[in-house]
Design a protein with these regions (language model features):
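Short capping/connector residues at structural and topological boundaries
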Residues: 23, 27, 36, 51-53, ...
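Flexible, active-site-adjacent loop/turn segments at secondary-structure boundaries
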Residues: 16, 20, 29, 46, ...
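Secondary-structure boundary elements
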Residues: 86, 104-190, 271-273, 303, ...
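Hydrophobic/aromatic-rich core segments of domains that either
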Residues: 162, 194-289
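C-terminal accessory extensions/subdomains outside the catalytic/core fold
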Residues: 251-253, 257-354, 359, 363, ...
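Intrinsically disordered, low-complexity N-terminal segments that are enriched in acidic
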Residues: 1-113
Length: 394
């Protein structure tokens, strides 16, 4: 197997056309990929139209790149366009059978563990319940046959991944972004987000650390057909803590029953989806709207970048650089179970949540920048935003 990196150009574009003007908005974006030992960012930018009243880039508590933005004046649309060139080096674990027994990892992460390493303490953040992942006996019961005594932890995780792949059906209509994992377990249907949450819940129920990974998966068009701009989708998978291995965290994709390698591009990691939603925040106004989402993953060593993806969004134009479909196109057959609907569902949740980033500019400062003839209405708006800002982010 060659160690040559595989290079990609990825464009993820989202558009909102609001039913009525949005007078105030604060948002948190997870659209920039994180640098990993096997993943290097050659070029990356996030363009936003209209231009935000303020913008700040930084890191979230999990080390992911994050962008905070706010709008203090009325606007009728929002376009977000993340474009990146990225190189992914082969990084499959050499021998998962040599990973430590799963019980030893469980004991290492236990409350009374002695002298934990800093890596172990960090992994403990992914050991407990989170917004979308509850720890239930039913999950432990489902996973226990994959973890007989003394089985290496990565072999157990691989067996659990294969079990989910075999017993569950990919069905974008079966669940929503908020469907509990016990309901997913009962229905045996869902999408990549559901399967990732389920596998994470099973591992945590056994006392093991597991985290949620968001990113992109390369899909290939049918033979003889061109790559369709916007026909790819966001994807989600799982990372399992296996100390003393070549990489302490090893990824598993239960949707496709494989260990992610050079065809998976990582954007962010968190306890579950709510930590790393591509767009999350609050708006005042806007009415009802459906997001339009287009994702295009181009392998640079095999194809040229489509011309329509090379030019950034023009600020103030209100125009995207690609025609965004009302519904995502179906992924290519080679990844038939990839998350065709996750992009839309991600943004549906972002629209409904009333949670503001912790590091937003204060509402009082925001009001100073709003036109004086609208002060009365906007003081009321500020009160709403201030109340929402008091809700802690997951």
């Amino acid at each position: 197997m060659t160690d040559k990196p595989v290079r990609y150009h990825v464009v993820h574009e989202t558009r909102y056309d609001y039913g009525s003007p949005v007078s105030l908005s604060q948002q948190q974006l997870h659209l920039s990929p994180r640098v990993l030992a096997w993943q290097q960012i050659e070029e990356q930018r996030v363009d936003i139209d209209p231009v935000p009243s303020w913008r700040r880039d930084g890191q979230d508590p999990f080390g992911n790149p994050v962008t905070w933005i706010a709008f203090h004046s009325p606007h009728e649309h929002l376009i977000l366009r993340s474009a990146m060139s990225i190189a992914v080096t082969p990084h499959l674990p050499k021998n998962i059978a040599l990973s430590p027994p799963w019980e030893s990892v469980r004991d290492l992460l236990a409350y009374d563990s002695t002298a934990p390493r800093s890596e172990d303490l960090d992994a403990m953040r992914f050991l407990f319940e989170s917004s979308h992942v509850r720890i239930k006996h039913e999950l432990a019961d489902y996973a226990v046959d994959c973890f007989p005594p003394k089985r290496p932890i990565l072999l157990g995780a691989q067996a659990l991944m294969a079990k989910i792949f075999k017993e569950f059906t990919f069905d974008p209509e079966a669940t929503t972004v908020s469907t509990p994992i016990l309901e997913v377990l009962e229905k045996k249907r869902g999408v990549c987000q559901d399967f990732a949450h389920l596998m994470i819940g099973c591992l945590r129920a056994l006392g093991l650390s597991a985290r949620y990974v968001s990113g992109y998966l390369l899909t290939r068009p049918p033979p003889g057909k061109p790559r369709l701009i916007g026909a790819d989708a966001s994807h989600a998978w799982v990372s399992v803590y296996a100390p003393d291995c070549e990489n302490d965290w090893v990824d598993f994709d239960p949707t496709n029953n494989l260990l992610p390698n050079t065809e998976h591009i990582t954007v962010a990691v968190g306890r579950d989806f709510s930590d790393i939603s591509p767009l999350r925040g609050i708006i005042l106004g806007g009415g009802g709207t459906e997001p339009e989402v287009a994702v295009t993953v181009t392998p640079l060593d095999e194809e040229e970048i489509p011309a329509g993806l090379l030019t950034p969004v023009e600020a103030g134009s209100g125009k995207a650089k690609v025609d965004l479909p009302k519904a995502q196109a179906k992924p290519a057959e080679s990844a038939e179970k990839s998350a065709a609907k996750l992009g839309e569902r991600v943004l549906d949740e972002a629209e409904s949540e009333e949670i503001a980033p912790e590091e937003m500019e204060s509402d009082e400062a925001a009001l100073d920048n709003i036109e004086s003839d609208k002060k009365t209405d906007q003081k009321s708006a500020a009160a709403v935003v201030q109340a929402a800002a008091g809700v802690p982010a997951a």
